[in-house]
Amino acid sequence: MKNYNTYILIIIISLFSVNCNDDFVDIPPEYSIDSENYFNIPEDYAQAVIAAYDLLQTTYLNSMLGEIASDNTLCGGESATDVPGFQQIDDMIHTPVNDNLQDLWSWMFAGVQRAAYVIEFKDKIDFDGKDALIAEAYFLRAYYNFELVKWFGPIPIKAEGRFSVGDEQRLPRSPISDVYELIEDDLLAAIPNLPLTPGQEGRVTSGAAKSLLGKAYVYQDKFDEASSILEEVINSGAYTLVENYDEIFEHQGENGAEAVFEVQYSDAEGASFDCFQCSEGNIAVGFNGIRQYNGPVFDSGFSFNVPTQEAVDAFETGDLRKDVAILDIVRWAAQRGATYGRGYEHTGYFNRKYIARKGDSNVGDQNLTNPNNYRAIRYADVLLLAAEANARKTTPDENKARNYLNLVRQRAFGTTSKAITASGSTLQDAIFDERRVEFVGEGHRFFDLVRTGRAAQEIDGFTPNKNELFPVPFEEIQFSNGNWEQNNGY
C-alpha cells in the first residue's frame, strides 16, 4: 500500500465497430476490454480498490489549505504572488476561479468515481475476500465525499454507482443532509466486513470506518450517535496514545499504536510541477519546508503554511507538544548553527510535524516527493471527538468527557496535574482549545471553527453566511449548463 501507483488500475476503453453483411457473424474481439466487462476475476477487484486508494495521496492539498484558511497559519511562500490560489484562501478573498480549489474538487471526485466503480459491479462475481474489498470501496467513497461536503457543501451524489457524462446537467447538488446520509450508509455498510486490524499497512479497518462515522456525526451535531460509535472504537482496545508525542510524526512513528488511518506516502516515485497528482510523496512536506535551509536534521522547502504567533501562544506553559508541532527557526538556528532564508509573511515558525527531514531520497523534485505519511485519523482525535460528543449530547456525560479530554492532556504534559475539572460550556471550550493545540498543522482547524460557529470571530476576513463553504469551481458551474447554483456570496 505504500506505493499505490504500483498497482494502479489502467482501464482501456476500446470501442470497436465492424461493418458486415448477412454473410458474417459479429464476433467480439478476443482481447477487448472496457469498463462494463472489466470485473471478471478477484484480482480485478483488488486492483480497482487500490486505484481508489490512490487519490488519497492528493489530500495533501486538503490538509494544507485546512490550516491556511484558518487562524493557525499564514500562506507564506516566496512572495504575495506565489501560488495565488493559496494566498486568496488565506486572505478569504478566493473566488470560483481558483486553480487549487478546482484541483481539490476534481481529485476528490476522481476518488469518488473510482470507489463507485467497484461498488457498481459489486455483485458481478463471488469469491473469498470480496466483501472486505467492497467494504474498503464504501469507506473510500465516504472519505472522499466527507472531504467534498466539508469544502463545498451540497454536491452531486449517486448511490448506485459511477457518474456518467452529462450527469452534471441532470443531477442536482444534493443537500448537505443527503450527502451525509450517503456517507453514513456507506460506512455502516463497510463496518461489518472490515477487519479490526489491517492485513496490510494502510488498509482500512473497522476502527477507521467507525471513527470516520463518529466524526461525520459530530459534524452534523448528532452527538448521541457520535458518542456511541466512538466509544466502540475506544473500547475495542485496538488503539492507544503513543507515550511520547514527538514520535508520532517521525518516519519511524508511521502506522503506530495511535494510527487509526494514515494516508500512505513514498519517495519511490517522483513528480513535477506539471503533475502534482502524479507524486507518490507528500507534497505538503516540501511546501511547508524551511526556505534555503542549511543545517542539521531538516531539509529545505518553500516556506508555505507558516504558523502564527497566536497559534504558538495557544500552548500552555509546560505543554510538551509545542516544540514538536512548532519549529522556532530563530532559536533553532542559534542553537544548531543553521542558516535559512526569509519567505513572504515570515513568522519565524514552521510546521515541524510536516517538514522534510534529511535522509529522504525524494525522487524527482525533492520538494514534491516526501515519504512522510499523513496521519488522517489519530486515536487522540477519537478521544477528543468522544469528549465533545459526551459533553454535548442530549443527556451529557461530563465525567466521560473529562476523562477522554484528560487522557490527551496527561500525555501532553506528562502529568495528571493539568487535568480539566470544568463543566458546562467551560468544559466544551476546553475541548475546543485542546483540539487546536493537539492538531495544529494537521488541517482540521478551519472546519472545527466553522462547525462550532466560531470562524467569524477567529479568522480575519471571514464573512458569515459565505465563507463557511468554498465556491464550486467556475468550470463546474459552466458544465452544468444552469443546473447548479453557486454557493452563497460567490
Predicted regions and their residues:
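Flexible, polar/acidic helix-loop-strand segments at domain edges
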Residues: M92-I93, E310-R378
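Structural register within alpha-helical repeat arrays
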Residues: I134, R141, L213, Q220, ...
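Long, intrinsically disordered, low-complexity segments
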Residues: C20-F24, P42, Y53, T73, ...
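Conserved, well-structured interaction surfaces
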Residues: P42, A46-I50, D54-Y60, V83-F152, ...
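TPR-repeat structural position
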Residues: Y45, Y180, F223, P396-E398
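An aromatic- and glycine-enriched ligand-binding surface/loop that stacks and positions planar moieties
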Residues: N21-D82, L188-I191, R203-R342, I459
